[in-house]
Amino acid sequence: MFGIGAGVSFFVNYSHKNLPVQSSPAISTPVPAGTEYASVRELAEQMSRPGGFTSEGLVTYLQERIRTLDPQLRSVIELNPQALETARALDQERANGQVRGPLHGIPILLKDTIETQGMQTSAGAFALVGAPAGKNAPLVDYLISQGAIVLAKTNMTELAGFRGTPDGWSSRGGQTRNPHHPDADVGGSSSGSAAAVAAGLAPLAVGAETNGSIIVPAALNGVVGLKPSVGLLDRDGIIPASQHQDTPGPMARSVFDVALMLNAMSARKSHDSASVEVDYTKLLVPDALKGKRIGYPVTFTANGEVQALENSAQFSKTLEVLEAQGAVLVPINLRIADASGYEKLLLSDVKEELNGYLAKRTGLPVKSLTELIKFNEDRDGKDTDHQPDLKKINDSTLDPASRETAWNELIQDFRSTVDEPIKTHTLDAIVSDFDTNSYFGVAVAGYPGITVPSGTTEDGLPTAAHFFGTRLSEPTLLAVAHGYEQAAQAATKPEL
């Protein structure tokens, strides 16, 4: 265990038996078993009624759950040593009649790419462990201003998958496990955020995505994950990969809680934001699906050839639920855009933006991608190529002017694959089986998508439906996803 900054600790080997036990005054009302799976509204109701438990009690309860379960899951990489103190202050505010909003006193988790004052922001990499972040990312300040409590930072695929290591593994945090089965795919790169929410370690988490990093782990761990339109949420203070695709996003166990988070996360505008004042819970009402025109792919076109899609039994059931709730299902053809130049463009973006971030970030062992690669070689040796993607990124030679022109053409092509069927068939949204990997094209387009649990496989692992649409269609997507979720009731709890 190393001491970093004034009174701040982090754990190199992440040994839970060494986690500091913070003292707290006696809590009059114990937090009952099962509270770990309560919704935000249920938690707020408990904390607001006479005789209910406090936020301090809830934080204590979840900290103990982390200490008990997470040595196996390895979803949490660092506890916030100020969480209990913050909870006490928020309890006092509530007692004084001051409630900041629906997230008042609610614990949240943050992916380890999001700068958090007094805590490490390392993307799971030892090379980025040093002086704690000097301030919060604006997104974190927005959440705190609404009363949310940063409970911990979450483990992730190291460097958001750009080191070239297995999903959910980082040198700092180890291998995150899927709480539904330790050998199941956990997804990446927001692995810890999804696994921890699924395991009841916190009700809410913030993930971040370039391509699939929210949607994939949310689907595989059986929780709800929203990847917003690129630019909707503030990205300052988040370790970057590509300005063309990066976005933070909320993860929770229900669509309503995701919408509450999105309200808090978009509370203030920034130069990066395309948002307007929207209450993302407004359309989450009974009969939200009635009359909604929802497209679903029955064929796809790739390289000019039309091929049929065979629905899984699980996805066929999803369509049945949607239709039973009054949705108008429209079969569509989904064109697959040409992604042949995508990897080259993305890796070139990562090289420029990661180098720029490291150069500006103070107190870290490395200041550039070249130094990062050398750090890893010095620490882990050169006998095995344990950072193939980092080396490919560092070898990129694409010039910025050529890259921007190519990006614009690529993004427009990918956007048209979503826009065309929506316009042609006057659709409110499109739904697909998560297993079709539709999230890839949605991410390249910079468009929003949300994954919702749809049941389980024969092996008991979560399945998911993926709803997506055109730019800034989040209110409609949330409404459709909520309507499906409430009718399907398909989410399952892991047998930990």
Describe each region flagged by the PLM:
Residues 1-86, 317-320, 324-327, 374, ...:
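An N-terminal boundary/leader segment
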Residues 31-211, 229:
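Gly/Ser-rich catalytic/binding loops embedded in alpha/beta enzyme cores
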Residues 43, 123-125, 177-182, 189, ...:
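Flexible glycine/proline-enriched surface loops and loop-helix/loop-strand junctions
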Residues 45-52, 63-71, 81-84, 88-96, ...:
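Sec-exported extracytoplasmic/periplasmic mature domains
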Residues 104-123, 288-299, 348-413, 453, ...:
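Short helix-loop capping/hinge segments that flank enzyme active sites or metal/cofactor-binding pockets
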Residues 105, 145, 149, 202, ...:
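Glycine-rich, small-residue loops and helix-cap segments
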Residues 227-313, 489-495:
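A short helix-breaking turn/cap at a secondary-structure junction
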Residues 253-278, 303-337, 355-375:
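Acidic-enriched catalytic cores of C-N bond-cleaving enzymes acting on peptides and small amides
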